[in-house]
Amino acid sequence: KNQYKTPTGFQNYKIRKETIKVKDSSDVILEVKETLHGPVMNGFLDGINGAKPVTMSWVFTQQKNQMLEAVYSLSHSKDLPDFRKGVSLIAAPGLNIMYGDAKGNIAWNTSGKLYKLDESVNPNFILNGTNGIDDKKEFLDFSKNPHAINPSWNYVYSANNQPEAVDGYLYPGYYLPQDRAKRILGLLEPKNNWTKEDVGKMINDNTSSVAPIVASNLISALDSKSLSLNEKQAIEILKKWNGSNDLKDIAPTIYNKWIYNYLKNTFRDELGEANFKMLLSTHIIKQIIAPQTKNENSVWWDDISTKNKKETRNEILNKSFHGAIAELEKQLGNDLNSWTWNRVHTLEHQHPLGKVALLKGIFNVGPFEVSGSNEVINNLMFNFADSGEYVVNGGPSTRRVIDFSDIENSMSILPTGQSGNPFSKHYNDQAEMYADGKFRKMKLNKEEIIKTSTELIFRPMK
């Protein structure tokens, strides 16, 4: 109970107490057990309740992390070497940091104190802290961090995708699939004469280069003899789809419902309801969607709740499609032409106090019907749910276009507004523009700022 196993024998836990103050209630006292690999998370994190202790090991707590110095250095950097010096001060988190200057230099560099594990170790799973192998780390010099400086292809980008190997080694990480990266490359490669208006359009691009391929994989599994009229019409819509997720598109409504049903019918029987919902909230599920549709030999296709029967890929995808169309008919009606994306994909900026019904109209901003989707450049993302409604739970915290040859006419937009005061006119004055993919001119000229500013005076109470 008070000891844990290590490669050199058993050691005592270091035990500390943490006190959480709760307003208008008793303090919550937590007893935390510390090991060589970090704190034991059993009982603290959902899904970790077994007898074997599971600890959390994080570079952030193990290395010198000069975050404030890094921010200061980056803010005051004069050139590329200054920039890279600032990035090198960040031990964690791992970030893709972009650079550009008025002299035409461009670069990107990952931050973080990166390391290599033994070749036999799979970091996608919980590691064994007792064998002396899984926890061996070779910390790497900053020069080994993935980066590109003035690359021959003349641009840099990041979409949280897997970077190329360094010295033959692919750094493991919690990456997103290649969807956005593929679309960005597809837009950048053919064109050299970019304007800030072109870049603004690209930032709001709603098209997936991958989704039509996935849709084709799904369609290939269908038994065409068993389709209703609505199902046949739905298939034709998906066959003609270019991957766009605009307000009046019908295909994304059908596609996402089918995707959700296929994931549910594939994984929920093995994982159970709680773990399946947890999986839906991770990056892992986004990595799974495309390759699983092609993997006919996957053991996941079998529904373990059915006895004396082994389901196949085709059976699960057919079942998922029929269910998707039936559910959409119930949710949106029998007219497929009315199944437009704006009816199910919405954005509402929710305030903690907005959960109170009487205060919702004061503090919450929206909802708005919005274009975009998961894993498109206009990444207004959502989690799948039985409801068939795709409520945005994340997206760009800001959109900016800065032309170094015309700084004073740069463009930006915020999701809601500049003020956090719900009674300010600037609390939500950008929200509709943001939802519509529009921009506002940034004020970077001192004279213009002074000319259009207002004065706020704070007077002490007497």
State the predicted function of each range.
Residues 1-220, 224-227, 240-462:
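C-terminal/peripheral segments of proteins
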